[in-house]
Amino acid sequence: MKFVLLFGVLLVTLFSYSSAEMLDDFDQADEDELLSLIEKEEARKDRIPKHHECTSNKHGCCRGHLFKYKCQCTTVVTQSGEETERCFCGTPPHHKAAELVVGFGKKIFG
């Protein structure tokens, strides 16, 4: 009887230890996933949407449907005669053509 009781206590102790280890692993995985999501959200907030100014951050444009938007710049002459560069995030013409072809392909085959 003592042997069965000792074996039972040992079994319960091992079971509680292993379940505690598994819970710690799950908690760590949840924390890692949460940190990853927070980092992605921060990176997304730093991105510049389409048609917004990107003069100070030319590589920070968002992604479009298929391609990343490109920072397109033009030179503007102000009323005082100064030339300044103004940039905006947009879709280049060759990307627009590719998106149009893909859109037609989806309508025909999709």
Curated annotation (Swiss-Prot):
An annotated GO cellular component: extracellular region
Keywords for the protein's UniProt record, in alphabetical order: Disulfide bond, Secreted, Signal, Toxin
Pfam families to which the protein is assigned, alphabetical: Toxin_35
Main localization of the protein described in the UniProt heading: secreted
Disulphide bond pairs: 54-71, 61-89, 73-87
Family annotation (InterPro entries): Spider_toxin_CSTX_knottin
Tissues showing expression: Expressed by the venom gland.
GO MF annotation terms: toxin activity
Location(s), subcellular: Secreted
Residues in the signal sequence: 1-20
Keyword Cell inner membrane assigned: no
Propeptide positions: 21-44
Family note: Belongs to the neurotoxin 19 (CSTX) family. 03 subfamily.
Protein name: U1-lycotoxin-Ls1gg
